[in-house]
Amino acid sequence: MSVDPSTLSLGGLVTELAERGECRHDPDLHMGPDAFEDEPLAERLARQDVAREVCEDCPVWALCLDYALRIRPAFGVWAGHLPRELAALQREARTLAAAALEEVA
């Protein structure tokens, strides 16, 4: 079932992700250890690589990306992206939107 992310509230997106996201099987893979547990760099990078692979086949990838772009997470892997990558996608989208508006004007 394909759902248009723009038609869902944040709550609706959370529900879809919780019910259908591949990350629901192992949330720690995508979020990492809790704030009180240290994670060595090599382990974090390896975990993030595996999380990205899981995201590749996720049936709600587009919903996850939409959700992540809305909430701007500070940590974790969302739709195969780290927070800094999501921020770069947002900047690029704003730049493209501004350029498109200039062309119309």
Predicted regions and their residues:
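Short Fe-S-cluster ligation motifs
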Residues: 17-18, 23-24, 81-105
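Amphipathic, hydrophobic secondary-structure cores in small proteins
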Residues: 52-85
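Short, flexible helix/strand-to-coil boundary loops that buttress conserved ligand/catalytic motifs
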Residues: 34, 68, 90
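Immediate flanking context of iron-sulfur cluster ligation sites
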Residues: 10-27, 31-33, 39-59, 70
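Polybasic, low-complexity association/targeting segments
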Residues: 1-13
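Surface-exposed beta-strand edges and their flanking turn/coil or helix-capping segments
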Residues: 38, 45, 79, 91-93
